[in-house]
Design a protein with these regions (language model features):
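Glycine-rich nucleophile elbow surrounding the catalytic serine of serine-hydrolase chemistry
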Residues: 91-101
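Alpha/beta-hydrolase fold nucleophile elbow
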Residues: 82-93
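Short, surface-exposed basic-aromatic patches at helix termini and helix-loop junctions that form
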Residues: 49-50, 76-80, 102-109, 160-165
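A conserved short beta-strand
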Residues: 107-122
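Structural motif
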Residues: 36-40, 60, 92, 145-150
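Short, surface-exposed "cap/lid" segments of acyl-processing enzymes
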Residues: 2-53, 59-60, 64
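Alpha/beta-hydrolase active-site loop
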Residues: 62-82
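The feature captures the conserved acid-bearing segment of alpha/beta-hydrolase catalytic domains
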Residues: 121-199
Length: 200
């Protein structure tokens, strides 16, 4: 990585996970953390300041090799900024899969996933089907899913059905405008998360 603005976290085997972190523009006792998980190109362009959120944008490769580092990073940032109980996760496409996975593992308040694949094919991932992580006894984030409107049988509907069977809150009623640029879509999602946080 040649981007001098990127920070990184490293494990005992010198595996590095690069990321950007932008603290909220205002100082307050209640500043949640939002983790933005998207593909590498979008992660590079999503470095913007948002008044009421701490923004963590990992630049990562998908797969098991970075899962533990990403969990460590989320925990570390949340502790440093005293927002362990106020974590929100957003991702689109493959980043939507990661958002659901990391939201579950970090016990986030809410996850927004835009057209996420739920069942991964041709992968060595131990979480090849995210519905296997659901159960009726553990606590889970509230899931806000936006699927493919042209394909009602997509993975989003499959995951939503599994959530409902396990008594987990899931909503399919909010989709940002897909024709907008990524930063605009993210701001739309953050405004939505603000409304969700104010209701809790």
């Amino acid at each position: 990585m040649c981007d001098k603005d990127l920070l990184y976290i490293e494990d005992a085997h010198n595996q590095k996970l690069y990321y950007r972190f932008t603290p909220a523009a205002v100082v307050s006792n209640f500043i949640p953390l939002v983790v933005v998980l998207d593909n590498e190109k979008k992660a590079h362009s999503s470095d913007f300041e948002y008044k009421m959120w701490n923004i963590l944008t990992p630049v990562y490769t998908h797969g098991d090799e970075n899962k533990e580092l990403l969990q460590k990073l989320i925990k570390q940032i949340a502790q440093e900024h005293e927002c362990e109980d106020h974590i929100y996760v957003y991702g689109s496409s493959t980043g939507g899969y990661e958002a659901i996975l990391q939201g579950i593992l970090s016990k986030a308040n809410a996850v927004f996933a835009h057209t996420p694949p739920i069942r991964l094919l041709d992968t060595n991932s131990t979480q090849s089907d995210l519905t296997n992580l659901l159960n009726p006894t553990d606590s889970f984030p509230i899931f806000y899913l936006c699927g493919n409107e042209s394909n009602p049988e997509d993975d989003t509907a499959y995951f939503a059905d599994a959530c409902k069977k396990n008594g987990i809150k899931v909503h399919l009623d909010f989709c940002p405008k897909s024709d907008e640029d990524e930063n605009h879509r993210l701001k739309e999602v953050l405004n939505f998360f603000e409304r969700v946080a104010s209701q809790n």
